[in-house]
């Protein structure tokens, strides 16, 4: 598109001249990525479900209110949104849905009923624009049950709430869906998938919490906020720990699941009341990616509510096919796990007013930077 070509030389994230944009170019990228023999073998032998992250649309997508305000003002943004969401819907999201969910999916049914390619293109374009600009127009999160195992896959990109005073990786509707999907599960094992790790390497976790406070847009400290925003985008501080309200909500949800608390139901008076689901699951496994390396963590929930819970909690962060990780970042990862750095970063976060979480975690295996699974 001309708007993309004209962005050359605009500077910073405004220059999209060397990037893909429309549906056709995204289709080429899927073809190029998935034709690799190793990728084809993996997808043909291992059942898969998928969830979008920033590079499905653009690097740093929805990292902050300031980022979104600048990007949505660019003349090429609409074409980018259409290409990204339309291709993701076709190539990835439809494969996440069960047959009954496909029957109930209005966009899918409209595409099947369309008489021409032009009509299908219009349907996908309208859907993509609405998915980006209208709350509730789409839901990318989904759940799957495999016997006594439930997988809950979370969209932590498209549904973000970016108000600087109350940043969250999900808006209230998406979070309520997440709670019900986890608390309604009468299962032995609960898997919660998120493109972003919930529990970062310790020092990085504390840095993200500190940065969120510093980058908060406040009239009394505009320069501090600008510097904090620059750090956030430069170092990619955009995981759960950088959205502390959501991180605390997640820890609270894990605690409820481990305690055997069921989802809220409405009584005859219209009041939400908690129900008991009974025996909590034997395990909760959080799945994450994004960070170009792999590691396994043991997670300990510290609330008295789960003092006697049998539920074991782990997080597995994995990149079966990962992008290269510079030696400098590998060194940062090593420093983030042991020695004085995590302690110093924790003190920095506490000095900024970041709350102590009701959870602890430790590295059980990793950090690995090679391709493949964790054994």
Model-derived regions: residue spans:
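Metal-dependent phosphoester/phosphodiester hydrolase catalytic core
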Residues: 1-375
């Amino acid at each position: 598109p001309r708007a993309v070509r004209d962005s050359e030389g605009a500077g910073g994230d405004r220059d999209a001249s060397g990037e893909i944009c429309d549906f056709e170019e995204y289709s080429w990228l899927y073809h190029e990525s998935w034709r690799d023999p190793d990728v084809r073998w993996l997808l043909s032998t291992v059942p898969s479900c998928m969830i979008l992250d920033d590079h499905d649309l653009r690097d740093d997508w929805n990292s902050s209110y300031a980022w979104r305000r600048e990007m949505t003002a660019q003349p090429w943004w609409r074409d980018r949104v259409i290409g990204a969401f339309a291709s993701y819907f076709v190539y990835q999201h439809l494969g996440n849905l069960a047959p009954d969910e496909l029957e109930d999916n209005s966009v899918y049914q409209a595409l099947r009923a369309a008489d021409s390619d032009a009509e299908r293109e219009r349907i996908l374009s309208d859907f993509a624009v609405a998915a980006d600009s209208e709350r509730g127009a789409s839901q990318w999160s989904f759940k799957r049950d495999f016997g006594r195992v439930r997988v809950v896959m979370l969209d932590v990109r498209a549904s973000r709430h970016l108000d600087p005073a109350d940043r969250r990786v999900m808006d209230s509707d998406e979070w309520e869906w997440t709670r019900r999907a986890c608390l309604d599960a009468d299962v032995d094992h609960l898997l919660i998938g998120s493109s972003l790790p919930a529990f970062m390497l310790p020092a990085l976790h504390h840095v993200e919490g500190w940065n969120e406070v510093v980058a908060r847009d406040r009239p009394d400290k505009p320069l501090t906020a600008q510097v904090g925003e620059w750090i956030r985008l430069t170092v990619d501080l955009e995981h759960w720990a950088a959205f502390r309200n959501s991180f605390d909500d997640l820890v609270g949800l894990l605690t409820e699941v481990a305690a055997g608390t069921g989802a809220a139901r409405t009584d005859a008076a219209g009041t939400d009341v908690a129900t008991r689901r009974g025996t909590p699951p034997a395990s909760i496994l959080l799945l994450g990616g994004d960070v170009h390396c792999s590691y396994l963590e043991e997670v300990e929930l510290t609330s008295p509510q789960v003092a006697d819970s049998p539920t074991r909690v782990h997080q597995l962060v994995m990149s079966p096919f990962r992008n290269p990780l510079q030696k400098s970042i590998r060194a940062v990862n090593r420093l983030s796990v042991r020695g004085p750095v995590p302690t110093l970063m924790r003190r920095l976060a506490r000095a900024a007013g970041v709350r102590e979480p009701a959870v602890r975690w430790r590295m059980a295996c990793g950090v690995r930077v090679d391709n493949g699974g964790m054994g």
